Amino acid sequence: MHKVHIIYSRIFQMTVTYNRAVSTESIHNFVSIMSYWHGSLVKSIWKEYAIWIVLYHLILFIYRVVMPIFGWADYCKKVIENWTPHQDMTIPLEFLLGFFVTTVIDRWRKAFQNIPYIEICAFAVAAAIPGRIRIINKKQNEVRAPGGQDLRDVPAVEVNHPVQRGPEAPAAALPMPGAPERPAVALPMPGAPEGPAAIQQPSVDVKLTARRTIIRYLVLSQILLFREISTKVKKRFVDLKCLVDSKFLTDEELKILSKEVKCDHYDSYFLPINWAFSILQEHKVKSNPEFINAWNVIRDWQVKLSLLRNGDFIPIPLAYPQAVFLAIRFYFLVCLFTRQHLDMDDKKSIDYYFPLMTSLQFIFIVGWMKVAEILLNPMGEDDDDFELNNIIDKNLYIGLAIVDTECGKHPEIVKDTIGKDCLPFYPQNDDDNERNRALVGSTKNINLSGRSDTPAASPSVFYVNINVKVENPTPVIVDGARPPPSPPALPPALPNPNEPPPPPPPAEALRADQPRHSLIHEVGAQADPAEANGAQALSPVLPNPNERADEHGHSPVIDNEAQPSPPPAEANRAPIPNQQPQVNGNAAPASPRQAKVPDDPH
């Protein structure tokens, strides 16, 4: 067992965090980032680069020293010159790496999102099984909870909720709506002594033990799965006996776990989750919302674990990483020959001694490939892999704290001292007081031509008339400029009573001079004379298009002797209700009282 603890001893944190070094933009960020060793680019590629540069200089020695002895230098030079133009075109490194790294990062992100954390489950369990209640044990030696906690020193606490024994429980055990909270209750176990001696014996907090056990089972399910997909967790918990020594399992639970898992080929992480569901069903009514919420969050816990398991079972198809890794390594294998400095006389070039540009290309391309290799399995032992052991410890500690020591506790409720302005506080010497500004829209503080968003303070307001009737058009005010008012309409001339009225014009003349949207009630020859006279009196007379308008744009006044009725002004012309429109050039024979004015289609 001590060997397991030595293996798990954390000398340094595996996941490298560098956010503090790049908290502000500065010229020192590059130096700060490049100063890291664990998880760095240099650490991941220096071995392969050392092998490559040694092979490069070995081939350089053969080409410059050995080949001239046998007279093969010119032949090798021609072969290498023929390879060089086709090297970059036949192996598309950027294309292969781009798609591959994108796919790997997407799987890495999904794996990170599916790592379950215990906080939401602990809050839901604490809400589903609230309060505390103690039951007197029969023997003082049997005072250990399943997790190994010694309960002999735990003092008695108040009981806020009764114990629910199931359908056989008496009706008095269920709280009525509005009933006061019950006092502390100590329920004796069968065969336990009665009287003062029973109060002095140790007791077990049933609800507290249930909450702690559910959290322990959830963390246990996480450990059982991580042992199958992570080598770091496997080294910490070599076998199930290590879980008993670490108090994640009891001896009785280990026997049940060993008996129920008949086949070693399948995982067993679902059994502790099943136990947690059973405990939750025993301590809560199913119809309560808190029970449903706790059920859902535990189900989400299982779903995330199953997604992690499926991602480990079915990785990216093997041919894809093989093609990418082989293409990159073969490319730089060819570079050992094609990037040689072939001109023996040009000794001033830096490539004559060291391949500078090829080395930079090797660092960038191979480093890019190493990123994909590291992220391909984030459950491994690389520097930037997930810290699963730390996640297990955190889930256990935080979960037990929420359902045990911090359950049902809060500070005393007092009135806050925040003012009505609710302004944030900054120290007087803090630069953030001047830097921090409100997050508002990008065009909120732009003032165009002195206008404001408040209508009362706006110097010019737009009025838009969308009425389809055009008899009385509404003027449009733009930028405070109002059009000149129209002159008042001229009153119609009074008819001369001494002169007889002229005969009505024939229907053909009216039909020829009629505009498209005019409303004319045609009086036929078969209509009654009285009705025809009434229709003539009510029908408007169209102005003559040959007549000229006055200086104000209105039609001239027409005497009653020349026309049957004066034309009203265009601005004051109102629709005449009982009037029949023309249909297909013929007036509909209807009474003036029954005629209707159709709506203007425009």
Curated annotation (Swiss-Prot):
Q: Which residues cross the membrane?
A: 50-70, 85-105, 313-333, 356-376
UniProt lists compositionally biased (Basic and acidic residues) regions at 510-520
User: Which residue intervals make up region (Disordered)?
Assistant: 477-602
Keyword tags? Cell membrane, Chloride, Chloride channel, Ion channel, Ion transport, Membrane, Transmembrane, Transmembrane helix, Transport
Bias (Pro residues) occurs at: 482-507
Q: List the disulfide bonds.
A: none
What is a GO molecular function of this protein?
chloride channel activity
> Where does it live in the cell?
Cell membrane
Looking at the record's lineage, which domain of life comes first? Eukaryota
- Does the record carry Transmembrane helix as a key word? yes
Tell me what topology the record assigns in the membrane. Answer: Multi-pass membrane protein
User: What is any one of the record's Gene Ontology cellular component terms?
Assistant: plasma membrane
Purpose of the protein: Forms chloride channels.
How it assembles, according to the record, is:
Forms oligomers.
Q: What PANTHER family does this protein map onto?
A: BESTROPHIN (PTHR10736), BESTROPHIN HOMOLOG-RELATED (PTHR10736:SF58)
In which family does this protein belong, per the annotation? Answer: Belongs to the anion channel-forming bestrophin (TC 1.A.46) family. Calcium-sensitive chloride channel subfamily.
Instruction: Please give the name of this protein.
Output: Bestrophin homolog 25
